[in-house]
């Protein structure tokens, strides 16, 4: 059942609606209509469930937090995850060179299949050495890091002068003993800790982000739904995520 607020005219009860609210596992939910977006006909409901939050996260990271330009080389950690695989495809649409990190040969192969130019298996290879090798010692202008503690030092060391460290998660914990003075000595670097909430705070920003995602999907961006769990097995889904046993996106089915 769909009931629109008074004055809301651009939502249709005959078509699916998407949102990017976090921490919600439910069969039905009361939502403010201004925080919903209409889904285009070519995006199925399960696709939308997998791609809205992760896809709009990628949108703000690569288009607004740091606006990646054609020909630039970027380092993106956890490239075989849901956000990483979407980012890889979208960055390739933009003409970027993508260096990704992954935790296994299987995940590296998955990233390569999605267009990643260079995959570093961080359990077996030195990230900084490989980045310097790939960039002829120049480093990268931006690093996207959702891992945190385990990759922080390598991320900072992989940046070129005045490079940007985009820390958008900390799956391994927060870095130890980080001092802003390091930014000066490492090359006048920038560090930012963005979150999607502040990039879709207005309806205009929300629609702009969603429409950019839908356009990328129309141009071939695909979401990999590699795991599905019944809603009652949510705990199993969390255990799989915590054990790093998942790739791509995970969807709960009601």
Residue ranges and their predicted role:
Residues 92-151, 202-205:
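Adenosine-nucleotide cofactor-binding segment
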Residues 4-21:
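Short, small-residue-biased leader/transition segments that mark boundaries at the very start
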Residues 78-79, 147:
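NAD(P)H cofactor-binding loop motif with strongest signal on the N-terminal glycine-rich segment
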Residues 150-219, 254:
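Glycine-rich phosphate-binding loop and adjacent beta-alpha segment
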Residues 19-78:
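NAD(P)H dinucleotide-binding glycine-rich loop of Rossmann-like/cofactor-binding domains
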Residues 80, 88:
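N-terminal Rossmann NAD(P)H-binding glycine-rich loop of SDR-like oxidoreductase domains
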Residues 203-254:
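C-terminal hydrophobic helical "lid"/dimerization subdomain
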């Amino acid at each position: 059942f769909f009931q629109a607020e008074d004055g809301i005219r651009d939502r249709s009860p005959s078509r699916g609606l998407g949102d990017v609210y976090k921490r919600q596992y439910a069969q039905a939910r009361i939502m403010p209509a201004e925080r919903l977006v209409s889904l285009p006909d070519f995006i199925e409901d399960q696709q939308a469930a997998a791609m809205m939050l992760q896809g709009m996260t990628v949108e703000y990271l690569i288009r607004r937090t740091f606006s990646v330009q054609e020909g630039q080389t970027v380092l993106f950690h956890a490239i075989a995850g849901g956000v990483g695989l979407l980012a890889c495809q979208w960055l390739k649409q933009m003409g970027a060179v993508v260096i990704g990190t992954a935790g296994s040969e299987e995940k590296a192969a998955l990233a390569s299949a999605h267009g990643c130019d260079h995959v570093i298996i961080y359990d077996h290879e030195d990230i900084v050495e490989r980045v310097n090798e790939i960039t002829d010692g120049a480093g990268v202008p931006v690093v996207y890091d959702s891992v945190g503690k385990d990759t922080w030092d390598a991320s900072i060391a992989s940046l070129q002068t005045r490079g940007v460290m985009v820390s958008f998660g900390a799956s391994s914990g927060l870095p130890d003993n980080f001092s802003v003075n390091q930014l000066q000595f490492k090359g006048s670097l920038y560090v930012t800790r963005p979150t999607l909430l502040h990039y879709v705070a207005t309806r205009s920003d929300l629609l702009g982000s969603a429409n950019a995602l839908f356009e990328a999907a129309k141009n071939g961006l695909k979401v990999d739904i590699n795991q599905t769990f019944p809603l009652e097995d949510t705990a199993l889904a969390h255990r799989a995520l915590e054990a790093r046993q998942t790739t791509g996106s995970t969807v709960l089915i009601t």
